[in-house]
Amino acid sequence: MKKLTSLFPLLFLIPLLASCAEEKQVYIVYFGEHKGDKAFHEIEEHHHSYLQSVKESEEDARASLLYSYKHSINGFAAELTPDQASKLEKLAEVVSVFKSHPRKYEAHTTRSWEFVGLEEEETDSDVPRRKNDADDRFRVGRNFLKKAKHGDGIIVGVLDSGVWPESKSFNDKGMGPVPKSWKGICQTGVAFNSSHCNRKIIGARYYVKGYERYYGAFNATANKDFLSPRDPDGHGSHTASTAVGRRVLGASALGGFAKGSASGGAPLARLAIYKACWAKPNAEKVEGNICLEEDMLAAIDDAIADGVHVISISIGTTEPFPFTQDGIAMGALHAVKRNIVVAASAGNSGPKPGTLSNLAPWIITVGASTLDRAFVGGLVLGNGYTIKTDSITAFKMDKFAPLVYASNVVVPGIALNETSQCLPNSLKPELVSGKVVLCLRGAGSRIGKGMEVKRAGGAGMILGNIAANGNEVPSDSHFVPTAGVTPTVVDKILEYIKTDKNPKAFIKPGKTVYKYQAAPSMTGFSSRGPNVVDPNILKPDITAPGLYILAAWSGADSPSKMSVDQRVAGYNIYSGTSMSCPHVAGAIALLKAIHPKWSSAAIRSALMTTAWMTNDKKKPIQDTTGLPANPFALGSGHFRPTKAADPGLVYDASYRAYLLYGCSVNITNIDPTFKCPSKIPPGYNHNYPSIAVPNLKKTVTVKRTVTNVGTGNSTSTYLFSVKPPSGISVKAIPNILSFNRIGQKQRFKIVIKPLKNQVMNATEKGQYQFGWFSWTDKVHVVRSPIAVSLA
């Protein structure tokens, strides 16, 4: 009995010990808008009071605080236990509490601006045209850029991995004084001082508190990074120069690929750098960056206060989150309230449906499409079989070499399902030396496979897609001559190796080829709709070039992003929606310069309703299947900045309109001055330039309002036309809109109903059907996509 009694104190302590041992993590406590006009110290003390309510002492509360967001965003980031976070979430004024995590966000990793019609002319005449000028439909010459003053006066904030300030893309030669509206700073740090800012890079900051809380005090050796705004990676410099880089003659990637003039979309716009992404500690840079939510929110809060006009974010969540659990979404809403336009990448998880990032209707979500430029090499087998391949490898073969399949030349002990993958230390040098190796994609990085072939003494590599990769063949700066091939070609090569006694191969070097293929087409990697957070909002919004984009690079990183690679390049070719997003950000800067009073929603509308749905061959833009791409792939289409400057009509939306929309997705208490109505309008009635109606059972009436922004004669009449989704009736009431002044608004309804005589099979039920409608006068075509699924 005595022994049993002695256990009671221990039993009593177990829950207490468990509570003490409960792991602390970083949470963001979000309050929405600030109430009243409080000083910064008052706001921080208010945040401390909430922390103290769940902490054991004032010292503990202050030590746990990482950030107090004081400018536009009202909230804080702090170390909390799950129990403490749960208690805070129940308190008054708290909108949401959400956990940060290193794997919650990821970065979404020239000819491009010439292709869309924004190249800077070298002379005062548009003729003679240069050999590789883009099709007239994608070309505009000087007038549009001159009207926009090349973006001068507009400040673009880029939230990424920093900047390499020595790049020619960021020189300030001939630029005027820094805009008086600028309120930011040039934050100094390792290898970065105030002299690295200039009249081009007018501000730079870095945010590392969240990163250090997870990984410990910053260690330059382990982190392979700079504790400053300097970019160790290349991703940030690439995106920044794509948006607003200066024109640089004779730029090219390693090996001379894509040689020509490199320029951002708005080359005279000013650049503000917000470094919130950091190299993974003790890892190769090719594995990507870490972008912590609490650091990004601090960056957005500062960007708003600094006075940027545009924010470009080539980062997104790795899985969908409700808007109030997504720091980028919430930060962007506060930016939009200040009429800052936010463009963000759609993600690189395509072509699987429902994989999009950055789904909030106040964000311009950008997918990735192709250019008309390719890097074409060749593969010749000993039996005469020849095929063109994609290649940006600078290395060359002098003659045919024996050809082997990786599975036949591995060391003992490699797992059966990995023998074909050319993983590190898997190949047997005595069987590989001097030979071309067929390696298959799957596990391991593409660059790493080439490294392994080189380590084993191989003469070259054929990198074969597996079925899951489809027919989209990537190009990388490999360490050996390399040819990328499709699954069909892989089968032919394997058959040749199997049946020929002395198989051999020759890899031809790649070269830059223009007008190689119909463009644009959709990339396979670009994430696809539908919008899984709110299917009433059609996403993505638009698409822009994101494949094989040439732009500035970091002097601290090789083109392959591997530490053993000592090659250095001032410019690099990179792919991803990370690359398409800054294209749109650059276009936004130009539109802001021409129309400084336009709202963020008006600029989105102008870009979307003027986008192309056809390629340079005047055929529908294709998906990777070879079929016409639908709005879940390309949104409203491929962007046309010059047309967007004069869209005719726009679908505008105020900050309060976004708050009203928020009521439909259970965001009810962000702004203390706004209350949701008793009857909440459905999400599809938000005044968006596209329409999505999921699970249609009966007639649905969608409401929209357009504003006349036409130039010249203010009197105009627009007629309605429609191509309805299959099995759906779409009508407009009224079907004629007349305007007699600029700024005039007109309301209309779109009546959508299923056709009674439409017989659906089982596969059609629940599947989306697509169409479009437009308003047309004698000058403008204002086009909107439609996506409807039948219940």
From Swiss-Prot:
Residues 1-20 form the signal peptide. The keyword Nucleus does not apply. One of its GO terms (molecular function) is serine-type endopeptidase activity. GO terms for cellular component: extracellular region. Residues 134-645 form the Peptidase S8 domain. It is found in: Secreted. The active site is at D160 (charge relay system), H235 (charge relay system), S578 (charge relay system). Residues 21-108 form a propeptide. This is Subtilisin-like protease SBT5.6. The lineage of its organism: Eukaryota, Viridiplantae, Streptophyta, Embryophyta, Tracheophyta. The gene is SBT5.6.
